[in-house]
Amino acid sequence: MSEKYVFSEKHPGPLVVEGKLTDAERMKTESNFLRGTIAEDLNDGLTGGFKGDNFLLIRFHGMYQQDDRDIRAERAEQKLEPRHAMLLRCRLPGGVMTPEQWLRIDKFAGESTIYGSIRITNRQTFQYHGILKSNVKPVHQMLNSIGLDALATANDMNRNVLCTSNPIESELHQQAYEWAKKISEHLLPRTRAYAEIWMDQEKVATTDEEPILGSTYLPRKFKTTVVVPPQNDVDLHANDLNFIAIADNGRLVGFNVLVGGGLSIAHGDKATYPRTASELGYISIEHTLAIAEAVVTTQRDWGNRTNRKNAKTKYTLERVGVDNFKQEVEARAGVKFEAVRPYEFTGRGDRIGWVKGIDNKWHLTLFIENGRILDYPGRPLKTGLAEIAKIHKGDFRLTANQNLIIAGVPARSKAKIDALAREHGLIDDSVSEQRKNSMACVSFPTCPLAMAEAERFLPEFVTKVEDIMQQHGVGDEHIVLRVTGCPNGCGRAMLAEIGLVGKAVGRYNLHLGGNREGTRIPRMYRENINETEILAEIDRLIGLWAQDRQPNEGFGDFTIRTNIIRPVLDPARDFYD
């Protein structure tokens, strides 16, 4: 695709990419503010899916059309269309919900989805898999009835806003969480399409306007976090816009703003690369929404609409320069950034088990492998959480590590909730640190982009890694391990110490050199290798780490220090070196 750049005398970098717009831009332009013909399509009983532009437009309403890839070939032989069903992702800024909401969510999963499960995602919300077309409208109405929605959790908008799950510092977490909600609400689309289609609200005569997102919305997906150091559980460097909380005597006073992180790449396309976020500066809290809006509108106007593979904020920053982007944000917000305030990250993992907060309430973080809540043989996780929800008076909090926190438990209720959790397999004291720090995306059988297994592959693979670590005497340690089924990066393998990126069925690219804090991108070490080859490499490397590491040296740092792999310093230029 030929692209030409428009240069500005004020900003010497190329600000806007001119050329033929992508078909996604046509679709958004013609969609009548995201309505399309979704309402009519819902009444078409001849197909289980959505047709034409509606296939993509439903993403703005929080859904993806999928099918069961395990039976796709079989259905094709029978001359049947794929078994279409929708993934629906809830908007849940900061991951906080009430037990009453959870019980309704649980009931719908059991009664109205193919798989019967609730999947906690690493974007701190939950999603349903396997919603048939006849249940699409009811799920939106169910969410609305409990004060939730699925608006803007997919496609070219600001997605679900993450917030550090930090129940110990309850007051600071609450302040950060309130800002996550405010940012989410401020950046929502203003179109009435969602309410008209799903809630049967009457169309009004007024003209739709999108003062922030614009009539063609953003060039690409946009992700935002609110981060409370020293925890980087939200993996800020995977996100377009990040607000790092700066506190004074336990009170939130402002944010460091970082822009332009992102992990997605395309195999074989060296114009795509992961990127860590760049520091723009510090702002006091009263400027938060103005800065959020200015970053979004700058990306709206300057982002590449001619090539979706280069449309994210990270590519805009590389094209126009961080300083130019910063100046534009300042001009639009009417705010000058101050110097970045000191901050430090020490880890990303959740504190599994019971912790006591400064408010004297107790908080139980449950490890949910792969975030998949279902009644397994001997481990009825879904039933257990429902039983806890019936008696718990605090919050349920979903984490960006796909776990769940029973938050705000008074001392008198602690023993009862602990007993229920153990009875239903929600607490397992034998779970290793390695398993707690391993993560995978969904991948097969529902994800249409999957190239290799991830969620179904991870549990047994971790067992093999655990065995290797035990053999080398480091069984109590952990390595941040992530598996993603394709290079789009949902499993965040590009911020792992060991990252596996799906290349084909049974084959992965092996990346090394990230760190525990999530501030360094790993480099590809071996390409397109199978599980046996991966385990052989891991065995050898863990042996070296166990023998030659320095005190408290993480595996990723060890691989860099000993020149096993070179660090990625400037991914736009050296990721593929």
Curated annotation (Swiss-Prot):
Pathway noted in the entry: Sulfur metabolism; hydrogen sulfide biosynthesis; hydrogen sulfide from sulfite (NADPH route): step 1/1
PROSITE patterns in UniProt: NIR_SIR
Keyword terms: 4Fe-4S, Amino-acid biosynthesis, Cysteine biosynthesis, Heme, Iron, Iron-sulfur, Metal-binding, NADP, Oxidoreductase
Reaction it catalyzes: hydrogen sulfide + 3 NADP(+) + 3 H2O = sulfite + 3 NADPH + 4 H(+)
Coiled coil: none
UniProt record, GO biological process: cysteine biosynthetic process; hydrogen sulfide biosynthetic process; sulfate assimilation
Entry-linked InterPro entries: CysI, NiRdtase/SiRdtase_haem-b_fer, Nit/Sulf_reduc_fer-like_dom_sf, NO2/SO3_Rdtase_4Fe4S_dom, NO2/SO3_Rdtase_4Fe4S_prot, NO2/SO3_Rdtase_4Fe4S_sf, NO2/SO3_Rdtase_FeS/sirohaem_BS
Cofactor binding mode and count: Binds 1 siroheme per subunit.
Binding-site list for siroheme: C490
Binding-site residues, [4Fe-4S] cluster: C441, C447, C486, C490
An example Gene Ontology CC term for this record: sulfite reductase complex (NADPH)
Cofactors demanded by this protein: siroheme; [4Fe-4S] cluster
Molecular function GO terms recorded: 4 iron, 4 sulfur cluster binding; heme binding; metal ion binding; NADP binding; sulfite reductase (ferredoxin) activity; sulfite reductase (NADPH) activity
Documented EC number(s): 1.8.1.2
Description of how the protein assembles with itself and partners: Alpha(8)-beta(8). The alpha component is a flavoprotein, the beta component is a hemoprotein.
HAMAP family linked to this entry: CysI
Function: Component of the sulfite reductase complex that catalyzes the 6-electron reduction of sulfite to sulfide. This is one of several activities required for the biosynthesis of L-cysteine from sulfate.
Family, similarity comment: Belongs to the nitrite and sulfite reductase 4Fe-4S domain family.
NCBIfam families assigned to the protein according to its UniProt record, in alphabetical order: CysI, PRK13504.1
Protein's name according to its UniProt entry: Sulfite reductase [NADPH] hemoprotein beta-component 2
Protein source organism: Pectobacterium carotovorum subsp. carotovorum (strain PC1)
Lineage: Bacteria, Pseudomonadati, Pseudomonadota, Gammaproteobacteria, Enterobacterales
